[in-house]
Structures are given as C-alpha cells and as structure tokens.
C-alpha cells in the first residue's frame, strides 16, 4: 500500500478528535508555563552551544563547542539552537547575530527555544495514544493519554531545554518499533525494510539524546524481538547489526562527523548507572502526581488479582517500567524514572481497559473518571510552581 493510499484511508473520527483535544490541552499548559518563565543561564548555554553546532565550529582547538566537549548528548543542544538559527536565516542576519542577542527586547526567544521540546512531548503523547489504542482499544488509549497530558512532570520536561523528554520519546518509540519489527518478520520480507529503517532512526534519535537510554532501549528491544520472532530468530542478528551500525552513524552525524568530538561519547562515562529508589519515591509521593500514583496502584492490584489482565501487552510495559524506575545515572545528569513514565501509563491504560470490559463496568468507569479528574485538577494547580 502506497503512502497516498494510506493517507486516503486515514479517518479523523471521534477517537482521533478526543486525542487531539487532549494534546491541545497539553500544548496550552506548556504555553502558559513558558509564557510565565524567564530566561536563565541554562537557556543561554543551550542556545549558544546549539547555534555553534549548526552554524560554526568551536574556536577552541580540541573542543566541539565553546561549551567544551558535550557529554550529555548533542540532540537537546541542537534542538534548542535550531529555531534560533532558522529564525536568523529567514531574517537574513549574519551568523554573528541572533535573536538571542536581543533577548531582552524580543519576548518570543524563550518560546522559540522551547518549541522543539514541546513538539517532542506532543509526539510522545501521540505515540502513546497510538500504541495503547492499538493494544487496548479506545478506552485504554484515552486513560493513558489523559494521565500523560495532565502529568506535571511531562509539562515540566517540555518547558525547558533538556535531553530527558527527547530520550523518553526515543526510548518509547524504539521499544515499540522493535516489537512491530518482530511481528512484521512473520510476514513477507518486503515489509521488513521500512520498519528496520524506522527502528534505526529511533535508536539514533535516542542515542543522540542520551547514550544510556539508547543502550537500555537496545537491550529491551532485543529481548522482546527474540521472544516474538519465533521461527525468524536467526534473522535477528543481521537486523540488529544493521540497526546498531546505523545508530552509530547517526550518532556520529550528530557530532558533525568530527572524530575527536565523537570519541568523547566513549570517554565521558555517559552510560554509567546505579540503582536507587529515591527519585521514584520523590515522584510517587509528590501531591501533583497523586492521580498517577493512585492509578498505578489500582492497576498493580488488578493485575495481581485479575487473570485477564496478565498478558504480553500489559506485562511488557510493566517490566520496562519496573526496570527503569530504580535506575539512576552517575556519569551525567539523567532521569530514567521519566523514561519509565510512558510505559507505566501504557500498563495503566491496558489494565483499566480490561477492567472496563467486566460486568462491573459502571463502577470502574466512575472510578476511572474520578482518578482522571483528580490528576487534571492537581496538574493545573501545579502550573504556577512549574513556571518558577
């Protein structure tokens, strides 16, 4: 089926409209927070280093940018600097000038820098809805997306320059693309290639955001593909080999094909990690996240007691969430608990969708609505704190 045929088959019915409204509400929250923020030294660092990556090499010998060697991924810097570079090009200004230099007069500079991160957050929400709707139906998709769009931590991650929302999107996309590749391997070979290319792009995106996220995503993807490929397991070796080579090439490209800068990926300790439940405890005990915490607790209880909830779609998401939650990065700053959040919401959406198909549907429907309304109210109430 050609792309044009697929486009003609696309329908924007009520499920898509509800999802679009939820994503629009997330966009409104991000816009409100960004409008009430002020520019910081972190913004300046990301803007300056990002512009240098796009426009000119560092004047300092042996360094990729004037910020020094980038040890926590280039993608966030490039994302923050790209809108400023594009604006300068369209304005016809010299590369020595930028809207950043007029940041005190131009109020939209802060919004420009946050656009790529907000866009990535919206893409992650769309991917979460698409996956959960495919796996669990409309109800599972709406539960997961509602909790996502009214998660204060998602709004926070979308409204300042950082690699975490980028790594979270890449991680989620890589794992479920790998599952899709494993399913496609049961069919004709002509359907493999586009999915393998997409898988490579997802791994490359994740690696450019955070090396540890890419390594963990690769391990989970390999494990699920070995489990699902069945009679095609022998073909996994070349598939994963091509994906790994393509990922390294994309990561090399993110360093502008400069070997010295690229070598720092292997010398910076960016993939070092340890285990601690402190970040997860902070997240689940915070009042603005009470709705997510309550939903996760209910989902775990139902998963343990209701047999119909224990199948691959729910179990896979739960395993990844449980594996990521206790991980902490020791080499560079990172938030693996945030990488786990979309998988946790996928699990919640799946279990709630199963509960809504039982004879006690009305009771579960009322409980689900109460949890979602609680989380939405808490998220909106927390927005002023996020803007500070």
Say what each PLM segment does:
Residues 15-44, 55-61, 150, 244-259, ...:
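Transmembrane signal-anchor helices characteristic of membrane glycosylation enzymes that use polyprenol
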Residues 205, 223-308, 319-331, 374-388:
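Transmembrane-lumen/periplasm boundary regions of multi-pass, lipid-linked membrane glycan transferases
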